[in-house]
């Protein structure tokens, strides 16, 4: 497996990963990808990918992307689900279904944390449903609960 920085050419793959992240529960209906990506809150996570404050890493196997951790700065006027402040990028995490539960998400998270620190960020945030198994992975790499909204936690990690 190779891990590399995300770039503007990864836009389509990141949209696919955003769909996977947004529809993480296998019991939920699988709406068409474009229907999900067109939701106003989801558009905040992908429109104009590559703008200042965007970053992330991609996992590849034999040159084919299989997972991503990417982050974006949000504003108080248009926050993401895990918004903490305008200086803390919010992280999204997704791995292709066939490659899940193999440690790829944690490896990608740690790589993204290093990259974000090198870019001068001091913290990263995220939002996770309380019943999402990924919550335990986030805790293992250092994220801590800083808020709760309905059935989701806002988590933060110091870099």
Language model: regions and residue ranges:
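Conserved acyl-donor/pantetheine-binding loop and adjacent beta-alpha core of acyl/acetyltransferases
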Residues: 52, 60-92
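Conserved acetyl-CoA-binding loop of GNAT-fold acetyltransferases
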Residues: 139-149
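Conserved GNAT-fold acetyl-CoA-binding loop/helix
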Residues: 22-46
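Conserved GNAT acetyl-CoA-binding A-motif
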Residues: 116-129
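A short, internal acetyl-CoA/4′-phosphopantetheine-binding micro-motif in the GNAT/acyltransferase core
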Residues: 60, 90-101, 128
């Amino acid at each position: 497996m190779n891990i590399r920085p995300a770039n503007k050419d990864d836009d389509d793959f990141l949209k696919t990963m955003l769909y996977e992240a947004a529809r993480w529960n296998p019991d939920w209906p699988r709406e068409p990808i474009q229907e999900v990506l067109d939701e106003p809150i989801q558009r905040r996570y992908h429109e104009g990918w590559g703008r200042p404050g965007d970053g992330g890493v991609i996992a590849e196997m034999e040159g084919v992307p299989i997972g991503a951790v990417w982050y974006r700065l949000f504003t108080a006027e248009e926050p993401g689900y895990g918004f903490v402040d305008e200086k803390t990028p919010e992280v999204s995490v997704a791995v292709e279904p066939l490659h899940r539960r193999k440690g790829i998400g944690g490896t990608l998270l740690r790589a993204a944390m290093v990259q974000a620190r090198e870019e001068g960020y001091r913290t990263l945030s995220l939002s996770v449903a309380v019943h999402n198994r990924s919550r335990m992975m986030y805790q293992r790499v250092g994220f801590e609960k800083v808020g709760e909204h309905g059935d989701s936690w806002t988590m933060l990690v110091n870099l």
